């Protein structure tokens, strides 16, 4: 196998991705994760159509070129608005647009966004068709295996079937139902049981579709096992809290021969990015809040977290604090 060029972005593959996570997968987090893996598909936080069409569009769409392959996740349910936002994403250079049909929070439900849309498969199909008609880039859907009151396998197949008829070819399946009343988003990630067998049956019954599994996956060993059944795996919180897991993704899941980046090398690559962010008036903690898990499992990990989450706010020269944190990971 020939060595890969290290400067060119990898081709879009959904074999391994990091989930869209509110307040977490912002552009600074994605820049950091990209240092660890070239091939991982990265997703933005969910952006609502209203925010893009009526808010600070540049802020929501901004990213660094190194973040490719990169997908924008949209929240909305008005086909024309989603089509307009998909065009904005394509014009901004995103590789994919993903529709959120999985978020269970009350706040988004009131705006007909997220998991509640699983009860309206024809509307989701209309939304997907409008986006596909508007852009050349991929349009995908992330959804649950059901919602309370509509959680039979037949209803899941009806949902996927209608959205497939609209032209969608890639579905990311969070293998839990969403309970739309009485549970917080956090509880909705923990209380409904994981049912990988339902997602596996979906792949069996829709062999022509790309089915990516999401929910509760914590190790690359588990990823390899699931990839025997599914076309891809998506990690969420584990990738955020234990980011160095991504350093082995390219070799273990994509066959890359490039040596993995060390933790200290990842921090060194982050330093000029932080300097640029500060030069634009940004604060260092906007970036470093995303790297607190990098020292997980090492002596000094507590000090590392304290430096970057507490001391950084008191420092006259935050970069000096960053360099102290870097020293704790020297050679690792």
Curated annotation (Swiss-Prot):
InterPro entries: Aldolase_TIM, DUS-like_FMN-bd, DUS_fam, DusA, tRNA_hU_synthase_CS
EC number: 1.3.1.-, 1.3.1.91
Pfam families from the UniProt entry: Dus
Residues bound to FMN: 20-22, 73, 142, 174, 214-216, 236-237
PROSITE patterns according to UniProt: UPF0034 (PS01136)
Reaction it catalyzes: 5,6-dihydrouridine(20) in tRNA + NADP(+) = uridine(20) in tRNA + NADPH + H(+); 5,6-dihydrouridine(20) in tRNA + NAD(+) = uridine(20) in tRNA + NADH + H(+); 5,6-dihydrouridine(20a) in tRNA + NADP(+) = uridine(20a) in tRNA + NADPH + H(+); 5,6-dihydrouridine(20a) in tRNA + NAD(+) = uridine(20a) in tRNA + NADH + H(+)
EC class name: oxidoreductase
Active site: 103
GO molecular function terms attached to this record: flavin adenine dinucleotide binding; FMN binding; tRNA binding; tRNA-dihydrouridine20 synthase activity; tRNA-dihydrouridine20a synthase activity
Cofactor(s) listed in the protein's UniProt record: FMN
Record keywords, A-Z: Flavoprotein, FMN, NADP, Oxidoreductase, RNA-binding, tRNA processing, tRNA-binding
Site (Interacts with tRNA): 100, 186, 189, 302, 305
Functional summary from the UniProt entry: Catalyzes the synthesis of 5,6-dihydrouridine (D), a modified base found in the D-loop of most tRNAs, via the reduction of the C5-C6 double bond in target uridines. Specifically modifies U20 and U20a in tRNAs.
Family annotation (HAMAP family): DusA_subfam
Family note: Belongs to the Dus family. DusA subfamily.
Annotated protein name in UniProt: tRNA-dihydrouridine(20/20a) synthase
Species, as recorded: Pseudomonas aeruginosa (strain ATCC 15692 / DSM 22644 / CIP 104116 / JCM 14847 / LMG 12228 / 1C / PRS 101 / PAO1)
Gene it is expressed from: dusA
């Amino acid at each position: 196998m020939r060595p890969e060029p290290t400067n060119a972005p990898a081709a879009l593959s959904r074999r391994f991705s990091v989930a869209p996570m509110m307040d977490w997968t912002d552009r600074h987090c994605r820049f950091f994760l990209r240092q660890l893996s070239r091939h991982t598909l990265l997703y933005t936080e969910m952006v609502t159509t209203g925010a893009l069409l009526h808010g600070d569009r540049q802020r929501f769409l901004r990213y660094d070129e190194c973040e490719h392959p990169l997908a924008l996740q949209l929240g909305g349910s008005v086909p024309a608005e989603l089509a307009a936002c998909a065009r904005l994403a394509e014009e901004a250079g995103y590789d994919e647009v993903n529709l959120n049909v999985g978020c269970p929070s009350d706040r988004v439900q009131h705006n007909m966004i997220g998991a509640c849309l699983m009860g309206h498969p024809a509307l989701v199909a209309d939304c997907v068709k409008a986006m596909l008609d508007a852009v050349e880039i991929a349009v995908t859907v992330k959804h649950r295996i059901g919602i309370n009151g509509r959680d039979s396998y037949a209803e899941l197949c009806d949902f996927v079937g209608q959205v497939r008829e609209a032209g969608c070819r890639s579905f990311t399946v969070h293998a839990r139902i969403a309970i739309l009343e009485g549970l917080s988003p956090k509880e909705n990630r923990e209380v409904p049981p994981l049912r990988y067998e339902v997602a596996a049956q979906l792949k069996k019954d829709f062999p022509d579709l790309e089915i990516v599994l999401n929910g509760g996956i914590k190790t690359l060993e588990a990823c390899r096992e699931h990839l025997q059944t599914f076309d891809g795996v998506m990690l969420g919180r584990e990738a955020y809290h234990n980011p160095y897991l991504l350093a082995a993704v390219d070799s273990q899941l994509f066959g890359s021969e490039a040596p993995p980046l060390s933790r200290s090398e990842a921090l060194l690559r982050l330093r000029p990015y932080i300097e640029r962010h500060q030069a634009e008036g940004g604060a260092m903690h906007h970036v470093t809040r995303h790297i607190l898990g990098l020292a997980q499992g090492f002596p000094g990990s507590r000090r590392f977290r304290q430096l970057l989450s507490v001391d950084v706010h008191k420092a006259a020269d935050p970069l000096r604090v960053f360099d102290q944190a870097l020293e704790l990971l020297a050679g690792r």
